[in-house]
């Protein structure tokens, strides 16, 4: 079968022929329909410092997908061949304190598909049946293909009560864009998104952000004054940029709450005085709550949330290089590749 493989220890990704995997007793073989390119895939493609520490060459990458059940393991029940599914990309151990305590999204033994084990940029893949998420008929496959990052956005946006609140989102990547839309959809007052990429800021505005701010041209404090704000009640840090995080700390209202998804460089500093004396809450976010986030984000789409607005490109798998080029240049929202 075809698969996108990180074959060499340098920039690039390679379309190769690899064996079709065989499902174990508790696994399902999935025939992929569509897969989306994630920022993690771009890191692996670029072979940055994180990738060099984490990825073993020969890995099939990818973790955002939708497909149909092709074969059931001998012990699997509750699914049918041909059923359309996505899946939680974090495979957890099931026996640690957090898994047994109902917090599997915090499992310290988590294995990520397309990072630690072979992933979804392939014609077929295997997944534990317990990780599957059935996709309702009303949701098109091109949207279901990126439920994984949509779930990251939903986890962040729903971590704190944003109804009637002023929300600052630093970083207008696809997750930040989607989070802006969710916050407005559920009743936030002002949602302000910052970045330095005008293309992606436009997507955030289209998704419903009250104001988008290119911080290389406009002062966030000036925007706050225009909106008659003393500070932000909730912050969603999506950029992984220490300067953006420190700007957020500076602009938070006393008692504000911050959800952090962006990964900061090792050793990055922050102004701890602002966290302490403003009484801020800072919550790390990793992945999606299993499976409460999946339920809520599915219902959001079914209730009219315009997830389609972040989808900018659909390409056949043979044009994967174009997709990675668009992502590297920052000239795309979500890019979905088709295996059909």
Swiss-Prot record:
Q: How is the cofactor bound?
A: Binds 2 Zn(2+) ions per subunit.
User: Does this entry carry the keyword Zinc?
Assistant: yes
> Which positions are annotated as binding Zn(2+) 2?
93, 96, 99, 107
What's its EC? 1.1.1.103
Task: Report the main location listed first in the record.
Answer: cytoplasm
Positions with a binding annotation for Zn(2+) 1: 38, 63-64
Record site: Important for catalytic activity for the proton relay mechanism but does not participate directly in the coordination of zinc atom? 148
Gene Ontology annotations of biological process type: L-threonine catabolic process to glycine
Top-level taxonomic group: Bacteria
Which positions bind NAD(+)?
Answer: 175, 195, 200, 261-263, 285-286
What Gene3D superfamilies does the annotation carry?
Medium-chain alcohol dehydrogenases, catalytic domain, NAD(P)-binding Rossmann-like Domain
Supply the alphabetized keyword list.
Cytoplasm, Metal-binding, NAD, Oxidoreductase, Zinc
Q: Where is the active site?
A: 40 (charge relay system), 43 (charge relay system)
Q: In which pathway does it act?
A: Amino-acid degradation; L-threonine degradation via oxydo-reductase pathway; glycine from L-threonine: step 1/2
Q: Does the keyword Hydrolase apply?
A: no
Q: Which GO terms describe its cellular component?
A: cytoplasm
Q: Which cofactor does it need?
A: Zn(2+)
Enzyme kind, highest EC tier = oxidoreductase
A single MF term (Gene Ontology): zinc ion binding
The reactions it catalyses are:
L-threonine + NAD(+) = (2S)-2-amino-3-oxobutanoate + NADH + H(+)
The job of this chain, per UniProt, is described as: Catalyzes the NAD(+)-dependent oxidation of L-threonine to 2-amino-3-ketobutyrate.
Q: How does it assemble?
A: Homotetramer.
- Name by which UniProt lists this protein: L-threonine 3-dehydrogenase
Organism name: Xanthomonas oryzae pv. oryzae (strain KACC10331 / KXO85)
Gene responsible for this protein: tdh
């Amino acid at each position: 079968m075809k698969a996108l493989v990180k074959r060499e220890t340098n920039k690039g990704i390679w379309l190769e022929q690899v064996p079709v995997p065989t499902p174990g007793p508790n696994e399902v073989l999935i025939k992929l329909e569509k897969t989306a390119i994630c920022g993690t895939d771009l890191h692996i493609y670029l072979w940055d410092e994180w990738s060099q520490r984490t990825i073993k060459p020969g890995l099939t990458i990818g973790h955002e997908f939708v497909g149909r059940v092709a074969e059931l393991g001998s012990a699997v029940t509750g699914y049918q061949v041909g059923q359309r599914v996505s899946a939680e990309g974090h495979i957890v151990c099931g026996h640690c304190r957090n898994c047994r305590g109902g917090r599997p999204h915090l499992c310290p033994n988590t294995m990520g598909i397309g990072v630690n084990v072979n992933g979804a940029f392939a014609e077929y893949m295997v997944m534990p049946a317990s990780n599957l998420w059935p996709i309702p008929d009303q949701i098109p496959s091109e949207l279901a293909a990126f439920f994984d990052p949509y779930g990251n956005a939903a986890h962040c946006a729903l971590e704190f009560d944003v109804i009637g609140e002023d929300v600052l989102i630093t970083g207008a990547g696809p997750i930040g864009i989607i989070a802006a839309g969710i916050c407005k959809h559920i009743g936030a007052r002002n949602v302000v998104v910052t970045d330095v990429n005008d293309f992606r800021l436009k997507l955030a505005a289209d998704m419903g952000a009250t104001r988008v701010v290119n911080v290389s041209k406009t002062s966030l404090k000036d925007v706050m004054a225009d909106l008659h704000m003393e500070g932000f009640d909730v912050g969603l840090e999506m950029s992984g940029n220490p300067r953006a995080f420190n700007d957020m700390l500076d602009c938070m209202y006393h008692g504000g709450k911050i959800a952090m998804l962006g990964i900061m460089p090792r050793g990055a500093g922050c102004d701890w005085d602002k966290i302490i004396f403003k009484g801020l809450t800072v919550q790390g976010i990793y992945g999606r709550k299993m499976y409460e986030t999946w339920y809520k984000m599915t219902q959001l789409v079914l209730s009219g949330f315009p997830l389609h607005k972040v989808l900018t490109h659909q390409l056949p798998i043979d044009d994967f290089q174009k997709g990675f080029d668009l992502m590297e240049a920052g000239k795309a929202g979500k890019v979905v590749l088709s295996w059909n």
